């Protein structure tokens, strides 16, 4: 494991707020967390399903921001594997891929792509295509996410399916007016952060949507998920990907970003809105008992996070560091 004491010091000297993804990464593999968040050697995630998820979120929750966040490519987007190679080539700042033979071959070897070919020229031919060249040009020139028209059309269709579900759209159609007695506060894609009394680190996250209803004294938090499985598998997915951890973090974030009176007296509810691989849509309610259990579990995990953070120990997951694990 590569160690850098100077970067460790810089990390500890700056206030770090854990997001769902960074906390999940630390719990899964402290070594990967160290590489990505302390050494800052984090690879940009360019997988197609992740990009499509962001497009759907934007079209539904922030449609006016779409043009500032995405560039639509006239031709087809390369595969995820090829895009990772092209992304590696960005650092050379050379738009002419024909002048990057050695760099392309090195990137292909690193990503173990087209290594079954015997001839380097065949490997290069797979990358140095007109379609890839066009994508690479956009990659160098644009700071936005790049999608193609097929992706945009597919995402628009999925958003329309969500809108066709009246039960789901009732969660996304609260209207706020300028009337000073308006009882609703609505927030979409809201970046929140907070300090934690017991710890030197804090929490942060972008909450898809939450609605504060001052008439009913309720706060409804809504998280939109695009799933590669069926909605029938979503309860297991919540455990597998620790979506419950994300929900618990969001509850704390929202609770700490409202007044103390609201935090103490308003009831918080949480809903997962899911569109699955078959374009089935459903809003999963989370019971109060389940939310309380998730929040309790988060507080237990914060002790583990605190151990790694304060002791600066990232060699192994917590349970392997504090006791012997027996099979």
Residue positions per predicted region:
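Non-catalytic protein-protein interaction segments used by genome-maintenance enzymes to assemble
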Residues: 181, 185-244
């Amino acid at each position: 494991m590569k160690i850098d004491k100077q970067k460790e010091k810089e990390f500890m000297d700056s206030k770090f707020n854990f997001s769902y993804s960074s906390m999940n990464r630390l719990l899964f593999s402290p070594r990967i967390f160290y590489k990505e968040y302390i050494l800052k050697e984090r690879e940009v995630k360019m997988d197609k399903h992740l990009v499509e998820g962001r497009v759907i979120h934007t079209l539904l929750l922030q449609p006016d921001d779409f043009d500032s966040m995405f560039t639509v490519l006239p031709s087809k987007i390369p595969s995820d594997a090829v895009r990772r190679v092209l992304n590696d080539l960005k650092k050379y700042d050379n738009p002419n891929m024909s002048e990057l033979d050695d760099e392309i071959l090195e990137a292909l070897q690193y990503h173990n792509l087209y290594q079954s070919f015997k001839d380097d020229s065949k490997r290069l031919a797979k990358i140095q295509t007109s379609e890839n060249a066009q994508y690479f040009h956009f990659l160098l020139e644009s700071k936005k996410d790049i999608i193609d028209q097929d992706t945009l059309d597919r995402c628009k269709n999925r958003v329309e399916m969500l809108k066709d579900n009246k039960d789901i759209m009732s969660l996304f159609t609260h209207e706020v007016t300028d009337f000073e007695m308006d009882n609703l506060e609505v927030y979409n894609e809201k970046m929140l952060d907070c300090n934690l009394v017991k710890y030197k680190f804090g929490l942060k996250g972008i909450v898809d949507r939450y609605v504060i209803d001052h008439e009913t004294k309720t706060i409804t938090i809504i998280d939109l998920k695009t799933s590669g499985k069926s909605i029938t598998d979503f309860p297991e997915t919540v455990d597998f990907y620790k979506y419950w951890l994300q929900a618990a973090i969001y509850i704390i974030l929202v609770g700490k970003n409202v007044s103390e009176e609201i935090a103490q007296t308003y009831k918080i509810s949480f809903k997962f809105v899911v569109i699955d691989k078959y374009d089935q849509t459903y809003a999963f309610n989370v019971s109060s008992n389940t939310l309380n259990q998730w929040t309790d579990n988060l507080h237990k995990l914060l002790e583990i996070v605190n151990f790694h953070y304060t002791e600066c120990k990232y060699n192994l997951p917590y349970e392997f560091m504090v006791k012997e694990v027996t099979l």
